[in-house]
Curated annotation (Swiss-Prot):
Belongs to the bacterial ribosomal protein bL35 family. It comes from Bordetella avium (strain 197N). Residues 1-26 are annotated as: Disordered. It holds the Pfam family Ribosomal_L35p. One of its GO terms (biological process) is translation. One of its GO terms (cellular component) is cytosolic large ribosomal subunit. Keywords: Ribonucleoprotein, Ribosomal protein. Residues 1-15 have a biased composition (Basic residues). This is Large ribosomal subunit protein bL35. Signal peptide: none annotated. Gene3D superfamilies: 4.10.410.60.
Amino acid sequence: MPKMKTKKSAAKRFQVRGSGSIKRGQAFKRHILTKKTTKNKRQLRGSAAVHETNIASVKAMMPFA
């Protein structure tokens, strides 16, 4: 059986919290920011939690997290 490996792209994007929930960054805030309102950009700050329907697939990509 081959080695289990972590998907490095997922490891760079997600962090597992102590409670088991997974933290992710917000999308839509890297570029083309001039046409976005100040309110919209402010609301995109910080991080968010991965939805419960996606937690299993994210954990499968990071078997050691």
